[in-house]
Amino acid sequence: CLIQDCPEG
């Protein structure tokens, strides 16, 4: 992702 935490990265 960009800043926030994403399930992928």
Curated annotation (Swiss-Prot):
It comes from the Eukaryota. The modification Glycine amide is found at residue 9. Keywords: Amidation, Calcium, Disulfide bond, G-protein coupled receptor impairing toxin, Gamma-carboxyglutamic acid, Metal-binding, Secreted, Toxin. GO terms for cellular component: extracellular region. Disulfide bonds join 1-6. Its main location: secreted. The modification 4-carboxyglutamate is found at residue 8. It is found in: Secreted. Expressed by the venom duct. GO terms for molecular function: metal ion binding; toxin activity. Targets vasopressin-oxytocin related receptors. Binds calcium. The cysteine framework is C-C. This is Gamma-conopressin vil. The lineage of its organism: Eukaryota, Metazoa, Spiralia, Lophotrochozoa, Mollusca.
